[in-house]
Amino acid sequence: MSDIRLSGQTALKAHTGMGLYVCPNDDEGLNSLYYTIEVNDAQGVAFLRRLLTVDVKNIHRGEVRQSFILNALGLMTDFVWVAHLPDSDEHFRVVFQSLDTLAWMHQVAKAFDEDFTTLKTSTAILFADQTNTPHGLMADGKVQVMKTSKGEVLAMRVGAMTLLQGEEKAFENFTHPGMEMLDELSAITLCYVSKSPLAFAWQANDLMPGDVNGAAYIDFSDSSRMFIGRALTEARLKAGEAKKAVVLSSHQDEAEAWFENPSEVILLTEEGVPVAKSAFVGLLGDKLTCVAFVPQSTDSSRLIWMNGGEEQAYRVEVLS
């Protein structure tokens, strides 16, 4: 069985059970999948309120949210997890993907006289409908510190994904009955199936929140809080038709062959009108799967799937 086909089978097993992806970690800090900072003072809170599209003042102790970081043009430059740790009103952890973001954060922090802490920590992602901890089932949107034989692990759950952080040894040789150990492709596929493509692939295109179902990650409630990119984002969301995320699989044979020559997926109506493009493609079992952001009025079950550069079109199955 090829590695790609094996990834698809692993993703399918984890989708009906649970899976763990241990993220790459570079000791030099240059090629890690995630980077982490913490703030623990009033200046740090002000810094995050300027930087993030969610408002940390509305994240209570022990809660976690996801957020965009935008540039001045309103384009998404990163997608982050923001956890309000239980021990303090001003203690927040921010987990993001781009090393460029870290460099930019240092520049923005100077304006707030803020000296945040960069953490060296290992990260894993648990995919499961329910997250069991030594303290019982973990609620959605919550943070929990777990004490294990390999040190403390911080768990941050959003939907079917739980971000775990701890010492490197915490994830070494980790096994659990019924848990699939995921490779990168199977982990990405599960992100797409959970409608969270931005957890891995926000950098695939120049996107604005209005291009995706981005309203869930933006807090406009405080009119005086001018986060970077706010004005353009607010105007675009008001002017454009709301989008919904749909997970589709195509009725095409030999789906794994797509990965030999990846291309953008184009989704069309039955009349041949393009409604969306998607670069967020994975393999679930033997089915080529994608998540796309289409207008709310779209009948997803009638969409036609085309791979960029091909003339063949395929019917779709709506997974969610």
Residue locations for each model-derived region?
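Acidic, proline/glycine-enriched N-terminal capping motif
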Residues: M1-L70, G74-L75
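Long, hydrophobic/aromatic-enriched structural stretches that serve as scaffold segments
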Residues: A72-S88
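Conserved, structured C-terminal
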Residues: S2-D27, N31-L33, A83-S320
